[in-house]
Amino acid sequence: MDTCFFCGAVDLSDTGSSSSMRYETLSAKVPSSQKTVSLVLTHLANCIQTQLDLKPGARLCPRCFQELSDYDTIMVNLMTTQKRLTTQLKGALKSEFEVPESGEDILVEEVEIPQSDVETDADAEADALFVELVKDQEESDTEIKREFVDEEEEEDDDDDDEFICEDVDVGDSEALYGKSSDGEDRPTKKRVKQECTTCGKVYNSWYQLQKHISEEHSKQPNHICPICGVIRRDEEYLELHMNLHEGKTEKQCRYCPKSFSRPVNTLRHMRMHWDKKKYQCEKCGLRFSQDNLLYNHRLRHEAEENPIICSICNVSFKSRKTFNHHTLIHKENRPRHYCSVCPKSFTERYTLKMHMKTHEGDVVYGVREEAPADEQQVVEELHVDVDESEAAVTVIMSDNDENSGFCLICNTNFENKKELEHHLQFDHDVVLK
């Protein structure tokens, strides 16, 4: 029994049946690309990585032939559209067919494609399209990428020369400028030239103009030292550099005796003296002189919107970092930092640092990671890990005028205790009772 090669369900030997029409796979052609059915089937076999061996006399029923014809039409339209879009994209990146922004002064010149170049043999166009259709997809993609990279590597010797359209094949020309696959006329494309308002140079596209502006006219002004001629990237770094001409280093503050481990930390500290307050909160509008102060301030807004609450003691925190520090108090195997003068120990180094201020003038002290066994016994008896942070900061709020406005956490001076208390509460998440 002679059945359809593709579906195997239709009997093609019955000449009296309504489905007696038969299509030879080696000779019948699909209407869109005018390629044989065998070539379409070979392409489908390549998609599933299968070798197709068509026997002479293999035929298709009308239904299967129509399905393959529909598939062929879709593929031809797809390749036509893909060619048009990829060519237009490459043109947009290489000054072809750029559309200017509104309000810009441009020079417009219309591109006209001779009709004689468009009206060519339809079979030649179909051949070119179907060659793309039967190519392996990965090979096709690689070819497109290679073509694009090669064009990107070509240097434009004279940007002011008139743009010359590259040679394209007939299929591309019709897809871009002539008639579409359905016979409708497409609007004529226009190329544009744009002029730099700063130097007057003319470019073929808005893309090239923006590249020119970013490279030639958007450079940050150099800040040059009037003494030695060294260049710094901004005014602040130049101010820090002036330390070298005053007998200091870039790790020392110009306005106070403080010194830091890195120049960037020195610069952050000096912003406190400048008090420019160039960092602004986007939610409430408050301005700060240092970026870390703005960061701590943002944590306050985050705590108001979504506070982090300890499930053990029900205390709320502004950030995950401070919450993680707090959870150490509830752990039995938490890390300890022991005072070298008294038996107290702390989970945080900065609380130990503040605690050590209570021993100033008594002895020369240090920091120990471990305590002797006899001192650990005293620690357990004193229960020093209860509310240790509050006990540690009491030295800051004492009546000592020397330390009354000095933050031991970030080494910042304040005019009075009230400002210091506000700073500790909102910038370092210290609970003051």
Swiss-Prot record:
Gene Ontology CC entries for this record: cytosol; nucleus; polytene chromosome interband
Keywords: Activator, Developmental protein, DNA-binding, Metal-binding, Nucleus, Repeat, Transcription, Transcription regulation, Zinc, Zinc-finger
Domain of life: Eukaryota
Domain ZAD: 1-90
Motif (Nuclear localization signal): 187-193
Annotated compartments: Nucleus
Primary localization class, coarse: nucleus
GO biological process, one term: anterior/posterior axis specification, embryo
C2H2-type zinc-finger residues: 194-217, 223-245, 251-273, 279-301, 308-330, 337-359, 405-428
Listed Acidic residues bias regions: 149-162
Region described as Disordered: 141-162
Sites where the protein binds Zn(2+): C4, C7, C61, C64
Tissue expression notes: Predominantly localized to the sub- and supraesophagal ganglia and the ventral nerve cord in the embryo, after dorsal closure.
GO molecular function: DNA binding; DNA-binding transcription activator activity, RNA polymerase II-specific; DNA-binding transcription factor activity, RNA polymerase II-specific; RNA polymerase II transcription regulatory region sequence-specific DNA binding; zinc ion binding
InterPro entries: Znf_C2H2_sf, Znf_C2H2_type
PROSITE patterns per record: ZINC_FINGER_C2H2_1, ZINC_FINGER_C2H2_2
Known partners and oligomeric status: Homodimer (via ZAD domain) in solution. Binds DNA as a homodimer. N-terminal regions of the protein are required, in addition to the zinc fingers, for the specificity of chromatin-binding.
Functional description taken from the UniProt entry: Transcriptional activator that controls bicoid gene expression during oogenesis. Found in transcriptionally active cells. Binds to specific sites on polytene chromosomes of third instar larvae. Binds to the consensus DNA sequence 5'-YTAGAGATGGRAA-3'.
Name of the protein described by the UniProt record: Serendipity locus protein delta
Upper lineage: Eukaryota, Metazoa, Ecdysozoa, Arthropoda, Hexapoda
